[in-house]
UniProtKB/Swiss-Prot annotation:
One of its GO terms (molecular function) is manganese ion binding. GO terms for cellular component: cytoplasm; ribonuclease H2 complex. It is an enzyme of class 3 (hydrolase). GO terms for biological process: DNA replication, removal of RNA primer; mismatch repair. It comes from the Bacteria. HAMAP family: RNase_HII_B. Residues 16-207 form the RNase H type-2 domain. Belongs to the RNase HII family. The lineage of its organism: Bacteria, Pseudomonadati, Pseudomonadota, Gammaproteobacteria, Lysobacterales. Endonuclease that specifically degrades the RNA of RNA-DNA hybrids. PROSITE patterns: RNASE_H_2. This is Ribonuclease HII.
Length: 234
């Protein structure tokens, strides 16, 4: 367990308003990494069936998603797209998403508990990192479900735009079917060009298309946020 601030009060309190934070989609070859933060009222009963999203069926995740949104005092879901992932790297993109998600619930949360062993910089509240938190902490479990469901829905939408790749089935992960589609059609704008299986199949046309899309998105709020992150890390 890693602490950015003095979190002894957090560990000893049963009534603290704690934001659980988790991500989905660090490993895929395409699509965004999605981070969610959730705050529950600790005086209310736990939602039945909460678990690490990877241990739940899609139907169960969808059912729990509705309950989580209904019961949460606050929640925030952040998507960091493939262009930003390629600019920052997947680790820094995930850290950015976590910081933005916590900022989105900081008006309610007094502290944050984040799945993993690292914490983002410049969080707006005290925080702790909890290894295996998505299997240990109900609030992190809820965040993992919001992140996973949001990302899966987004990949189904991307399938309508790019039907050749089967995003609706593998959600961007490097399955044999996805790799075969990459070999046949080459990467699209949603592929992560910094990931080796995609990078090996890049063409000048694909690189130019990504650069054009990157320039088009230069003024987005999230782009400004990750520029600030890069400056702080220099």
């Amino acid at each position: 367990m890693v602490s950015q601030f003095d979190t002894q009060h957090l560990l000893n309190s049963n009534t603290a308003l704690v934001a659980g934070v988790d991500e989905a989609g660090r490993g895929p070859l395409a699509g965004p990494v999605v981070v969610a933060a959730v705050v529950f009222d600790p005086s209310q009963p736990r939602i039945n069936g909460l678990n690490d999203s990877k241990q739940l069926s899609p139907a169960c995740r969808e059912r729990l998603y509705a309950h989580i949104v209904e019961r949460a005092l606050a929640y925030k879901v952040v998507m960091i797209d493939s262009t930003q992932i390629d600019t920052l790297n997947i680790y820094q993109a995930t850290m950015l998403g976590m910081r933005l998600a916590v900022e989105g619930v900081a008006h309610v949360a007094k502290s944050a508990r984040i799945d993993g062993n690292r914490l983002p910089k410049n969080l707006p509240c005290p925080a702790e990192a909890l290894v295996g938190g998505d299997a240990r902490d109900p609030t992190i479990m809820a965040a993992s479900i919001l992140a996973k469901v949001t990302r899966d829905r987004h990949m189904v939408e991307l399938h309508l735009q790019y039907p050749h790749y089967g995003f609706d089935k593998h959600k961007g992960y490097g399955t044999p079917a996805h790799l075969a589609a990459l070999a046949e059609h080459g990467p699209c704008l949603e592929h992560r060009q910094s990931f080796a299986p995609v990078r090996r199949m890049l063409t000048p046309k694909a690189i130019h298309a990504r650069q054009s899309a990157h320039q088009h998105n230069d003024n987005s709020p999230t782009k400004a946020a990750f520029n600030m992150l890069i400056e702080r890390d220099d």
